[in-house]
Amino acid sequence: MLEKNIREQIIDLMHRQVVPAVGCTEPMAVALCTARATELLGQKPEKISAFLSANILKNAMGVGIPGTGMIGLPIAISLGALIGKSEYQLEVIKDLTPETLEEGKQYVSENRIDIKLKEGITEKLYIEMTCEAGGKKATAIISKTHTNFVYEEADGKVLLDKQVLAEEGAPTDNKDIQLNLKMVWDFATTTPINEIEFILEAKRYNMNAAEEALKGNYGHCVGKTMDRPLSRGLFGNSIYSHILSKTASACDARMGGAMVPVMSNSGSGNQGICATNPVVVFAKENENTPEELVRALTLSHLTAIYIKQNLGALSALCGCIVACTGSSCGITYLMGGDYNNICYAVKNMIANLTGMVCDGAKPSCALKVSSGVSTAILSAMLSMENHHVTEAEGIIDKDVDKSIRNLTSLGKDAMNEMDIMVLDIMTNKGAC
């Protein structure tokens, strides 16, 4: 068992990285930043200016905003200013009503919102919101993670500036323990169960999102389609088909704008879904014990957090690669696998899915989620037969942690030019 102080640091990390969110986290982070700038202004803004990193723009252009029936940033910004409360974090617009939605639509129609790409920055997650009214101005900036405010200014007075601290090399709030896969395994499998039972909240949130998808036609209805007779004829009424259905359904609801919270992982709701629902469904149908489920969910979520430590909050790689690697580990554990089997599953996932491009948050993410979950199951099955991709093949290293770093190096560094090209394609398409 890991030492108590190490366990406490990991638990603190999980509590910060596995949190509820309503809607896609990028537009919600923009709404959150808008809400804070509005609070600093102290009145309803007459004008709002947004300066955003390319990855924020990419992930917010085509996704449904919960409870609005609309997509994109203008309505998210409008609602952040009109009803948003920064204390709600990524549930910032949960007080939405039909009346305030109409106010938000009216605000958008008045062309009060200006959205631009922030030039000259390297940070992939950057949100700068400036609100103006009555000759007053207030600015809030979020950077690095979806709820991390680094700058606040009102009426020319700087109230918060973590950017200066970072530039001068002074200590910042980054206290995250640096993980490796063996540490993740040891924590998940040996920590006293009462210390990690909180992870069951992810099950409650994300399985509820899957049920919500059945109440409407969200996104491309990938999950609902998996439940229909034709799909049953092809895939059978099996654990495999149930896992795909429950995971894709939750993604359908979230990307389609359902007003339903999910438990996110590392700033992504879809990653939270992928790290949760496959493990929950497998544990139920495999008749695993409640304790085994808790440990499998912990292993899944913490594996995803570990990989994201190296990759960063946003990248050119589709996040389902990361989260489904986590769920593959969780399923492998539920199958009775040991640490070696977990390593095999991780290597199989990296060998299969590396290179899947993130082209923004949108309803079709449910298709990528289905591909990721399918690969997670296959990787787990192969690992339990001691079959795995070896160091003689591609980017896989004998050391599993080096294999993970190979994956993250590609996503964080090598694919930057591709990320720019993806955004250029997205912003220069003809009218839909």
List where the protein language model places each region.
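Acidic-glycine-rich active-site phosphate/pyrophosphate-binding loop
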Residues: M1-I11, G42-I56, S238-G257, T289-I307, ...
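A structural signal for small-residue-enriched, beta-sheet-centric alpha/beta enzyme cores
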Residues: L2, V22-T25, N55-I56, S143-T147, ...
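N-terminal signal-anchor module of multipass membrane proteins
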Residues: I6-L41, P45
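Conserved phosphate/anionic-ligand binding catalytic regions in large, soluble enzymes, centered on
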Residues: P20-R36, V260-N277, G319-V322
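Early transmembrane hairpin of solute transport permeases
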Residues: A31-C131
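Hydrophobic alpha-helical bundle architecture
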Residues: T38, F282-R295, I305-S371, M384-G394
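Flexible, glycine/charged-enriched surface loops at secondary-structure junctions
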Residues: K44-I48, Y88-I93, D114-L117, I193-I199, ...
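Signature of multi-pass transmembrane helix bundles
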Residues: S109-G257, D424-C432
